[in-house]
C-alpha cells in the first residue's frame, strides 16, 4: 500500500459545546465505530479510533469498498449497522469477534454500512492540508454512495450550512439512533487527534434507584460504580446503566455510607443475577470482547436510595453511555422512579436521513 496518507492515522476529533455554533458546516452525529478507510487497489484497511485495524471484522465492507470507492483513496467515516428501527450499536459491538466463522456469519446476518464524512487523500493527492469545504466537495464527487441506491454500502453523510436545518436534525434524528450534530468550520484543515470540530449532544436528567455497586479496580475500600435501576410498568426493577465518575475520597465515603443497605441476592430484585454464567451481573449480555478480564460482579443494595443523573439518550431500555452524577434525591420515593419520566424521541427512518440506507 502506497498512498499520500498512510495508516495508521488518528481521526480528527470534536469538542463538546452546549449550542450549535454559527458559520459552520453541520452534519448528523452518527453512532457507530469511527474508522478511516484506506484503499490502494485491492488493498483495503479499516482503521479505528485507537489506530488498531478493524478490517478482518467487516469483510462485507472490504468488498463494498473495492466495488464502490475510488481506486486509491483515504476516507474518514463511521461504520454502522442500520435496521428498520434505526442504528443498532449492540449488533455492531458483536461484530468484534475472534472467530472467523462467526465474523462471516454476522457479516451476512447484520451487514454493516460505511458513512463517509471527510476526504484525506484521493489518487496521488493529499487533501489533509486543504479546507474542509474543499474536502467535502471532493468527497461527494468521489463517493458513489452519495446517491439513493439501496444496494450500496457506502454513503456520504448529509451536510448543511443552514443552522435551522441543523437544529431540526438535532431534534428529529435522535429517533433513528443518531447522537446529535457535528459542526465543522469550513476553513479547517484535517488535523489528526485534534479537537477542532464541535459536537452538540442531548443532555437530560433522570431520577434512578441505586440498586448495587461495583468495587473500584484499586481495591475493595472504594466504590467503582453505582448500578442504576428504573421500574417497569409491571413493577419490576430494570437495570438502566451506571455512574462512576467520583473523586477517590468520595468513592471511599460512599462505600462506608452504603454498607447499611447491603443485602443478599435472595432479597434483591436482581436475584437471578447471581446464577447467570456464574457471575453476579445485572445484564445477561454484559460480557463482550470489549471488557475481557474485567470484573463485572456487583454488591447488591436494598433499592432505597435515589440519585438524579445526567444522560444523553437511551438505547433500548438503557442509557447509551455512562450516566453522570447530578445530586442525591432523598425527597423521592424509589418506587416513583420509572421509565415514564423519560423523554422518548419520535421515530425517524434512516432512509429519511440518507436515501437508500436501511
UniProtKB/Swiss-Prot annotation:
Cited function: DNA ligase that seals nicks in double-stranded DNA during DNA replication, DNA recombination and DNA repair.
EC number(s) per entry: 6.5.1.1
Species of the source: Mycobacterium tuberculosis (strain ATCC 25618 / H37Rv)
Cofactor(s) demanded: a divalent metal cation
Xref: Gene3D superfamilies: DNA ligase/mRNA capping enzyme, Nucleic acid-binding proteins
Organism domain of life: Bacteria
Active site (catalytic residues): 29 (n6-amp-lysine intermediate)
Class in the EC hierarchy, top level: ligase
Reactions accelerated catalytically: ATP + (deoxyribonucleotide)n-3'-hydroxyl + 5'-phospho-(deoxyribonucleotide)m = (deoxyribonucleotide)n+m + AMP + diphosphate
Protein name (database record): DNA ligase C
Disruption phenotype: Not essential for growth (in strain Erdman).
Sequence similarity: Belongs to the ATP-dependent DNA ligase family.
Pfam families to which the protein is assigned, alphabetical: DNA_ligase_A_C (PF04679), DNA_ligase_A_M (PF01068)
Gene Ontology molecular function: any one: DNA ligase (ATP) activity
GO BP: any one term: DNA repair
Membrane-spanning ranges: none
Keywords, comma-separated and alphabetical: ATP-binding, Ligase, Nucleotide-binding
Lineage: Bacteria, Bacillati, Actinomycetota, Actinomycetes, Mycobacteriales
InterPro entries: Adenylation_LigC-like, ATP-dep_DNA_ligase, DNA_ligase_ATP-dep_C, DNA_ligase_ATP-dep_cent, NA-bd_OB-fold, OBF_LigC-like
